[in-house]
Amino acid sequence: MEKYINNLKIKLYKNKFIILNILLSFIATIGIIGYYHIFTSYDLLSNSFINIIIFVLFTNLFNKIDWSKKQNNIFGSIFSLFLSSILILGTQLDNNSFINWNIITLIKIICLTFSIIPIIYLILSFLNKYKTKSKIINYKNVSLGTFIFIILFNIFVFLAIYPGLYGYDAGFQIFEILEKNVQLTSHFSYIFCLILANTVKLGKIMFNSYQIGFAIYCFLQMLFLSFVSTKITIYSLKRTNNIYIYLFSVLLFSVFPLYTVMALSATQDSLFAGLFALVILNILDMFENKNYWKNFINPILLSILILFACMIRNNGFYTFLVSIPFIILFKKDKKWLTLLIFLIPLILYKIYSGPVYNLIGIQNTDTMGEMLSVPSQQLARVYNYNNTVFNNKDKTLLNKYYTDVDKFTEYIFRQSISDPIKGLINNNNVSNDLSGYISLWAKIGIKDPKNYTEAFLLNTLGYWYPNKNYSDLRMYHPYIEYDMMNAKFWNKNYIDIKRSSKFKAYDKLLYLTLVKNYWKKVPIISTIFTMGTYFIVFIFLIGIAILRKKWQYFIPLSIILGLYITLFLSPVGLFRYCFPILMILPILLSLIISKNNIYLDSL
């Protein structure tokens, strides 16, 4: 009798989980239907036979979940809720430019969360079981072969878009250096402009051709980034000993068009991406290489890299500044020495951008508009969609801080770029009464948090939403530049650089992929093209670091966080600003896959 009762209890226990799995599978299926309902007819989806297949698949997936693993299940649930929110809210914003703040949206988020949970659980199970296998690899030979392979395929792109990509900033960057009567400003990196302009000038001196000079610059930049890419690839291989991660890295840096075109684009963002990646590699070397501190060159090199990264992109200073509290919190040994390694280049950068700029005669541009990009978008959205929030006093103040409030209507057409609105800021009035501006901004935000939230999310949509559609008229600019700048149209004194493709078939393929957005037509692969995917990988890595209690990795992660903060506060979500994240994507993946405290040879 007792045996019968025990068997009955076991059967009831199993039946309870069978019923739970069926219920969760049904909710997960509803989640998929609810998500795609945003794109198509609900009736069409709800009556579809495919839902039975989806339901059966979910039933099988939920059966694999071990509910006793609390940490994995808690992390999986939180991350699934986060990802579900991104997908539902991002889709609504991308399609409609607003969020449906109602119970239906909440239900969709909850249901889609259950659709994602089993997938995350399977990923976590794979990561828990994954072990880095020791292999004897001649890394010097692999490194050389990898470098040659990457260079070779990048040369094909160089020939296709010869002499390189002449973007809309490059014309002025060269012009302000070569023309003596032009006032130098801090808007662009002086060091970058100096290197670019003088390399172009060298082509004119040696070959009587600015075109060749421009080609020399782009080729040298491509060589530098190929060197960095090789170091990233070898690091990922050393850490994981995984052939698939190695192949992914090699293909990313040799044939992936977003990388190869940026490697040959005359923009400071490309150089910054290379320096940023070297900083991340150096910091990881600090944690993972026992002999790091034995070679005094390593910490000195790290300081130099941080300094040059700040000099190449002005907001690099804030990117690295974010890491300071994380060093204090999480660096166990040599904490104060590590702080000095970071603080010295940051102090030197402030000296460079202050007294040295004054000595050279560089005029510091007013950055007030850049700093207030997001607040300006938020105020403009409320002004257009909920004007009654502003009383007469508020409108008077708004007219004080902006030169022409009537032009706030431009926001309706440019909801993902702040240039039209931030260009209206009265810099003097805002600077003289910054507390008043902040007070007005906060007051309106408290009255209308809905539109403030939507304004912020729309302005940053590309950075966090993985299914973003391009091209998008709301952001005006293309996702990535490919067409050459029409220099003489903007300024008759600009140096004119024309594309003279030596590999026209490849040029046409790149044009169709990047300008006509053919990349969207390829399932799965298209996901790698969107910046939102990189953001999700980054957030997942943060969660994995917490789950594994790898607190030391929060120092390099804090630098990536610092970069994201500058991106989320920037005027528009363009790929070139996020290029550094693509560069380090193999590093992020290798940190996720390999959980062992392995020690690598110096990179």
Question: Which residues does each PLM region occupy?
Answer:
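Membrane-proximal stem/loop segments at transmembrane-domain junctions that anchor or position
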Residues: 361-503
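Membrane-interface anchor segments at the N-terminal boundary of transmembrane helices
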Residues: 34-53, 212, 216, 459-556, ...
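Membrane-interface alpha helices of multi-pass inner-membrane proteins
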Residues: 298-313, 324-325, 343-349
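Specific aromatic-rich, kink-prone transmembrane helix
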Residues: 118, 178, 271-290, 304-306, ...
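Extracytoplasmic catalytic/substrate-binding loops of multi-pass membrane glycan-assembly enzymes
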Residues: 161-175, 183-199, 207-212, 580
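Transmembrane-helix motifs of polytopic, lipid-linked glycan transferases
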Residues: 118, 216-240, 278
